[in-house]
């Protein structure tokens, strides 16, 4: 696969992204308030030096998107990003539906969650798989969540390059796959512009305490679809 193949696939995905019809129900925005970041007490966004006390700038955003392709039709994509959250982490979590029928009594699976594959991008690059396993021993059937974990740092002595190290190296080598093309940028803004325009009519974002995982709006957004955010 060469850089042009990767660019073509990224363009296909961006072209197939569909926004929710009800942006009020399937987007959330927030602005961090005072709280704790680790062991340090921190001020809220509006109290930061140089920030307009009436600023409506978001420091948190969450949205549901759909990808209108044969492979991903009907699969919701939930994206969230923010500042001053519980910790600094980037990951992709593929959470599977529970089977419509489990061949066990409900008491045997009451502690069983949904299977998931989590791709950790940073800071601890790796992959975690979560699935159900029978608790050994005993005469009764009990199934609980267990995890299998792979980490690059634990499996290899070589360290992965930092994000900007890789970008700078690609610039020197003239290798462009990680850089968005003009078309990719245009398609990205076609997704974001309607959301920004809608949010501009809402006034002040909902505050959330520093060190938490975002505003209550984001929790309610997923709850409407019968889901909840995964805690990294």
Go through each PLM region and give its residues.
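Secretory/organelle targeting and membrane-embedding segments
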Residues: 4-232
């Amino acid at each position: 696969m060469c850089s042009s193949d990767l660019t073509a696939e990224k363009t296909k995905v961006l072209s197939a992204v569909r926004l929710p019809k009800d942006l009020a129900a399937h987007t959330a925005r927030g602005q961090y308030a005072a709280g704790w970041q680790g062991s340090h007490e921190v001020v809220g966004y509006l109290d930061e030096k140089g920030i307009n006390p009436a600023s409506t700038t978001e420091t948190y955003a969450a949205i549901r998107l759909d990808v209108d392709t044969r492979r991903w039709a009907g699969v919701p994509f939930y994206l969230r990003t923010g500042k001053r959250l519980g910790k600094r982490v980037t990951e992709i979590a593929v959470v599977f539906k529970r089977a419509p029928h489990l061949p066990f009594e409900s008491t045997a699976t009451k502690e069983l969650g949904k299977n998931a594959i989590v791709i950790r991008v940073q800071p601890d690059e790796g992959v975690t798989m979560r699935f159900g396993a029978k608790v050994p021993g005993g005469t009764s059937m009990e199934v609980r969540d267990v995890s299998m974990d792979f980490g690059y740092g634990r499996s290899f002595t070589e360290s992965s390059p930092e994000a900007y190290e890789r970008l700078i190296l690609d610039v020197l080598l003239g290798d462009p796959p990680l850089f968005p093309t003009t078309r990719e940028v245009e398609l990205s803004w076609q997704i974001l512009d309607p959301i920004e325009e809608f949010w501009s009519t809402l006034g002040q974002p909902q505050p959330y305490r520093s060190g938490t995982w975002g505003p209550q709006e984001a929790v309610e957004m997923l709850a409407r679809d019968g889901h909840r955010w995964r805690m990294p």
